[in-house]
Amino acid sequence: MMTPGKSSKTPIVGNLTTLGITIPDTVTSIGFKTFYGCSSFTSIIIPNSVTSIGTKAFTGCSSLTSITIGNSVTSFGQEAFSECSSITSITIPNSVTTIRDFAFSGCSKLTSITIPNSVTSLGSHAFRGCSGLTSIIIPDSVTLIRGSIFYGCSSLTSITIPNSVTSIYSSAFYGCSSLTSITIPDSVLDFGSAAFQECSKLTNIKIGNNVDSIGSLAFKRCSSLTNITIPDSVTTIANSAFYECSKLTSITIGKSVTRIEGNAFSKCYSLTSITIKTTNDITSSITTDVFLNCPITELIYETTGLTFLTYEYFKDKVTLIKFNIPKSDSNSMIRLQEITSLPTLTHFTNLNKVTIENINELTIPESFIEGDNFEILITNNIKSIDPNAFKDCSINKFTYLGTDKLENDFLKNAKSCEEVITSTKYSDNEIGGMTITHKQSEENPNQPGENPNQPGENPNQPGENPNQPGENPSQPGENPSQPGENPNQPGENPSQPGENPNQPGENPNQPGENPNQPGENPSQPGENTDDPSKSKENKAIKGGEIAGIIIGSLIGICLVVAICFGVYYYFMRIKPKNKNDDNEGNQEDTIANGTNEVTNENVLATFDEQPNNESDSNGLDSAEV
């Protein structure tokens, strides 16, 4: 048996230079430091007669590349193969039950290792510094992953933790900088401090539903982690648990959390959103450094444990608060018996948006919010809103997608309210004392809806007929009947009798004649020519244009007839009469008794000559017409 003396502290075969060594079958154990520091030999065969390998038996055998371990070995001592920096692979026989601390630590070129189901115990630091190890499967027989077992395994990309594991100790995966994802099974009850610290490529981690605490530094500097959900089983998030997770954008705090310790999320420079499910008052345990240097802008409440709203750190950072309290949450329903309304949010100095998805029987209280340029979205029915809920608030947009009617003048009493949107199923045209400007479907709360009160959007709605009051383009500045503005009558005076465009049958406000009809003048309200929904209106416009052409043609024909009639009248009646007057000569006026007497012939002549004194023959023609 190759064992040192009781007092010996030196290796039995120290500084062995032989390239290969075979241990004889008579050997049953390899003792303490037997081949310690044998840096030259490259291979070793351990026979089936050997049952145990002692502490540091092969430590520092830096050229050793091949090891054959017999099937009778049951345990490896501490540091048995530590610092064997040239070993690339090891197969552990099914006879082994225990691998002790540091057994393979520092084997930097080890890329694969097979651990059989016979192994029930893996010691701490067992594979520490195995920087070439890329993957490992932990057998179902292992119940504990001890401290620093894979510390510094920087090439490890995947690992499977079996359902048999109940605890993960401190620094178990510290510095596994290539590990991208890991699933902690429900069998795990806790994991210690720094368990996943410096896992810089870890982007996804699922924490089991039975973990009761997250240790300090557990995920410190996991700089690729983007989101984390703390399961409902967790009660404590220890100090610096997620310290400097620089890409973490959102977290969900589970229902049972009662304590969050200092710097838990400090220096998470991208953390903007927190979802709170806990019903416990955790503000007393939170110090100001818990979220230090976190640009949090959004709080989402899925619980009635609303005391978290009083946390001072949030007051000048949060811009959006959302409430979504599930009706099926029994804990929430118990809490609902204790409170009747949401708390006021007036201490949030930069808050500008509130979304309420579900608050069950809670109401919105007086002085709920204050500030300017608010957007409020309520996606479901709520019990009531206090008439003075928004009295110190100017609202850009208020959206209510519930169907139950809301009483009180809560919008009218606000400092201002620019836009009011409801569901298409909301029966009234007013809400909160304000007229509804748009209605939209519940499925798409962010899209602008239709304004039931705006003219010009539905061609069948009242108020869209261009002849309706308020839309007559004959208003000052818009009358196409002004001289030179009617494209169908260039150079004509529409003020003459028979040509007034406001007379029946010639009204330019009829469909098709008004150049300001919807679809022709994009500056008119409600006449967006790019809207495909107005195809019916466009068809009406085309029909109107055809009618306008016909009417214009008729007017032109009438003008031609009038001119012809005037020419006829002149040549057939007026010109012959003038010739007769020349033959008769000038007659003397007869004056009797101080009175001018006019002969019948002069009266007739005077009547006949009158048209020649008119300055505008067209005027006479029009009168005759």
From Swiss-Prot:
<feature type="repeat" description="LRR 7">
    <location>
        <begin position="200"/>
        <end position="221"/>
    </location>
</feature>
<dbReference type="Pfam" id="PF13306">
    <property type="entry name" value="LRR_5"/>
</dbReference>
<feature type="repeat" description="LRR 13">
    <location>
        <begin position="369"/>
        <end position="392"/>
    </location>
</feature>
<feature type="transmembrane region" description="Helical">
    <location>
        <begin position="549"/>
        <end position="571"/>
    </location>
</feature>
<feature type="repeat" description="LRR 5">
    <location>
        <begin position="153"/>
        <end position="175"/>
    </location>
</feature>
<feature type="repeat" description="LRR 3">
    <location>
        <begin position="85"/>
        <end position="106"/>
    </location>
</feature>
<keyword id="KW-0325">Glycoprotein</keyword>
<feature type="repeat" description="LRR 10">
    <location>
        <begin position="271"/>
        <end position="293"/>
    </location>
</feature>
<feature type="repeat" description="LRR 2">
    <location>
        <begin position="61"/>
        <end position="83"/>
    </location>
</feature>
<dbReference type="InterPro" id="IPR026906">
    <property type="entry name" value="LRR_5"/>
</dbReference>
<keyword id="KW-1133">Transmembrane helix</keyword>
<dbReference type="InterPro" id="IPR032675">
    <property type="entry name" value="LRR_dom_sf"/>
</dbReference>
<keyword id="KW-0677">Repeat</keyword>
<dbReference type="InterPro" id="IPR053139">
    <property type="entry name" value="Surface_bspA-like"/>
</dbReference>
<keyword id="KW-1003">Cell membrane</keyword>
<feature type="region of interest" description="Disordered">
    <location>
        <begin position="577"/>
        <end position="625"/>
    </location>
</feature>
<feature type="repeat" description="LRR 6">
    <location>
        <begin position="176"/>
        <end position="198"/>
    </location>
</feature>
<keyword id="KW-0812">Transmembrane</keyword>
<keyword id="KW-0472">Membrane</keyword>
<feature type="glycosylation site" description="N-linked (GlcNAc...) asparagine">
    <location>
        <position position="227"/>
    </location>
</feature>
<comment type="function">
    <text>May bind host tissue.</text>
</comment>
<feature type="compositionally biased region" description="Polar residues">
    <location>
        <begin position="588"/>
        <end position="625"/>
    </location>
</feature>
<feature type="repeat" description="LRR 8">
    <location>
        <begin position="222"/>
        <end position="245"/>
    </location>
</feature>
<keyword id="KW-0433">Leucine-rich repeat</keyword>
<feature type="repeat" description="LRR 1">
    <location>
        <begin position="38"/>
        <end position="60"/>
    </location>
</feature>
<protein>
    <recommendedName>
        <fullName>Putative surface protein bspA-like</fullName>
    </recommendedName>
</protein>
<feature type="topological domain" description="Cytoplasmic">
    <location>
        <begin position="572"/>
        <end position="625"/>
    </location>
</feature>
<feature type="region of interest" description="Disordered">
    <location>
        <begin position="439"/>
        <end position="538"/>
    </location>
</feature>
<feature type="repeat" description="LRR 11">
    <location>
        <begin position="325"/>
        <end position="347"/>
    </location>
</feature>
<feature type="repeat" description="LRR 4">
    <location>
        <begin position="107"/>
        <end position="129"/>
    </location>
</feature>
<feature type="glycosylation site" description="N-linked (GlcNAc...) asparagine">
    <location>
        <position position="15"/>
    </location>
</feature>
<dbReference type="GO" id="GO:0005886">
    <property type="term" value="C:plasma membrane"/>
</dbReference>
<feature type="topological domain" description="Extracellular">
    <location>
        <begin position="1"/>
        <end position="548"/>
    </location>
</feature>
<feature type="repeat" description="LRR 12">
    <location>
        <begin position="348"/>
        <end position="368"/>
    </location>
</feature>
<feature type="compositionally biased region" description="Low complexity">
    <location>
        <begin position="443"/>
        <end position="526"/>
    </location>
</feature>
<feature type="repeat" description="LRR 9">
    <location>
        <begin position="247"/>
        <end position="267"/>
    </location>
</feature>
